[in-house]
A protein has these predicted regions:
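Cys/His-coordinated zinc-binding microdomains
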Residues: 475-478, 489-492
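Structured secondary-structure scaffolds
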Residues: 1-239, 260-303, 307, 327-340, ...
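Short, non-ligating residues that shape and space the ligands of small metal-coordination modules
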Residues: 91, 480-483, 497-498
């Protein structure tokens, strides 16, 4: 049974295995005044236990009515009935080992009849998907449950066992009232909010002992603010977005949008795997890194010019690039709010309710089906979505595109690094004033847009202050701008309603 069980972390298998192998016989009785009584009568002359179904039925009925206190000398004759004399029998006053009590939970929980899906075709009951407790329970609940279930059911009561470490103070000491280092979760929630406490719990390696303190939570609070800012940006950038503006032909989208959808599909697959592996530390890290590095520091930064400046009288729905950007933002919103919901419970509800005040709770939504988010007009019953579709298969697998943009991002980082000295020296105030020379300029990439700079040329590495004039609308320094304050070609086109 141990070999058939999944253990998280894997070392739990050897731990419980060695304990079971070396344990002595289990004596189930305990001589205690309080507990679940062993309801047996013993013949005073022969020392034999009385095994009479009618007697047992009367004891069970009394226990259902009055609880375990019904097992008393005063009611002994009532249970024995007319067939036996109470004076001839000793009522056992021992109780069951409390670990036997806990080890029976699978029987009265899983086999309670409340979950029909757990019932097998042969009338038996499937094991629980997961038992979750502290690492000390390899000697306790996990082991007693295993022994009791194997002895009576012939199988482990669980498919997987997950053990967690314990929470220490900021210095790594065990919390104790005598040391005065205890921390109340209620106080933490009052000071930081429940979502920050949840984010901390899911960010640590819970399989080991972990620390908590004000400085640690301050770092988590900073991470939370970055995630919250991602949703704040999405809500603002999607204001007024509708189906008329939506673009569903991904092939017609700019390469940057296709790249971001591919990254999202890759994130989706990794998050699914993290959940399957109970690796919530990886889950929160992947989510935070995507929001901070791929979105805020890259995608949002590049496309803010398009968002603000590609809308005007001549383009009431926005340019095709702006429409593609907002279409991708909508997909990102629907995916990310679902990804964040198990972690940032209240924030996700707030975000969802802000955009869709009449749509019910975000926690009633299922895991996002990326293909159906991206291609909503292609119809079909969402309940019939294939497994491949659910994995966003149509958005993944473009290795060439991902590798190309990984190189572009690497070059972008180098350009940003070379611009910083000019900014510190106040030679330029913004990257928009920088003119860049690259040794290997690809012809199909709008480097000015990606780097958020003025003109980009092919040549030896160099960054200088541009002599181009500044567009009065988008603030980009471009060759076609005739004087500071005049308009660039793009802005003239967008504003020309004739």
């Amino acid at each position: 049974a141990i070999d058939d069980t999944r253990f998280v972390p894997a070392k739990g298998r050897n731990r419980i295995g060695s304990m079971v192998e070396g344990r002595p016989d289990w004596v189930l009785s305990r001589q205690r005044a309080w507990g679940v009584p062993i309801t047996l009568f013993v013949d005073r002359k022969t020392g034999q236990y009385l095994n009479d179904p009618l007697v047992n039925d009367r004891i069970v009925a009394a226990a259902k009515e009055a609880g375990v206190d019904a097992w008393s000398d005063a009611r002994a004759q009532e249970y024995l009935g007319d067939s036996y004399n109470a004076a001839d029998y000793e009522r056992i006053t021992d109780i069951l080992d409390v670990w036997f009590d806990s080890g029976c939970t699978h029987a009265f929980v899983l086999e309670s009849g409340r979950w029909p899906a757990l019932v097998r075709h042969d009338g038996g009951t499937h094991s629980a998907d997961l038992y979750l407790e502290g690492s000390d329970q390899h000697r306790g609940w996990f082991q007693s449950s295993l022994l009791e279930s194997c002895g009576t059911r012939g199988q482990a009561p669980y498919k997987a066992v997950l053990t967690h470490g314990f929470t220490m103070d900021a210095k790594g000491f065990k919390m104790s009232k005598s040391l005065g280092n205890t921390i109340s979760p209620i106080d933490l929630m009052r000071d930081y909010g429940a979502d920050i406490l949840r984010l901390w719990a899911l960010s640590v390696d819970f399989t080991e002992d972990h620390r908590i303190g004000k400085e640690i939570l301050a770092g988590v609070a900073d991470q939370y603010r970055k995630l919250r800012n991602t949703f704040r940006y999405l809500l603002g950038a999607l204001d007024g977005f509708n189906d008329e503006e939506r673009i569903t032909d991904v092939a017609a989208m700019p390469e940057l949008e296709r790249y971001m959808l591919s990254l999202l599909a890759d994130l989706d697959a990794k998050l699914r795997q993290a959940v399957d592996d109970f690796d919530y530390n990886a889950y929160t890290r992947l989510l935070a890194d995507f929001c901070n590095e791929d979105l805020s520091a890259f995608y949002f930064d590049i496309r803010k010019d398009v968002l603000y400046c590609d809308l005007g009288p001549a383009a009431p729905l926005g340019t095709d690039t702006r429409r593609a950007y907002r279409s991708v933002l909508d997909v990102l919103f629907h995916a990310l709010v679902r990804y964040a919901a198990p972690v940032l419970v209240f924030t996700s509800e707030e975000v969802w309710g802000t955009r869709y005040p009449d749509a019910g709770s975000v926690h009633l939504l299922e895991w996002p089906d990326l293909d159906r988010l991206v291609f909503p007009r292609e119809g079909g019953d969402p309940e019939l979505a294939s497994a491949d579709s659910a994995l966003g298969s149509r958005l993944r697998g473009n290795t060439q595109l991902v590798e190309k943009w990984a190189q572009i991002r690497s070059t972008r980082a180098l350009v940003t690094e070379r611009i910083e000295p000019l900014r510190r020296e106040k030679t330029i105030r913004s990257s928009l004033e920088a003119e860049v020379w690259l040794p290997n300029e690809a012809g199909d990439v709008d480097y000015e847009e990606i780097f958020i700079t003025s003109t980009v040329h092919q040549g030896d590495w160099d960054v200088k202050r541009t002599e181009n004039h500044k567009c009065g609308r988008c603030w980009r320094h471009l060759p076609e701008v005739t004087a500071d304050g005049a308009l660039c070609n793009r802005c003239e086109t967008v504003l020309d309603a004739q």
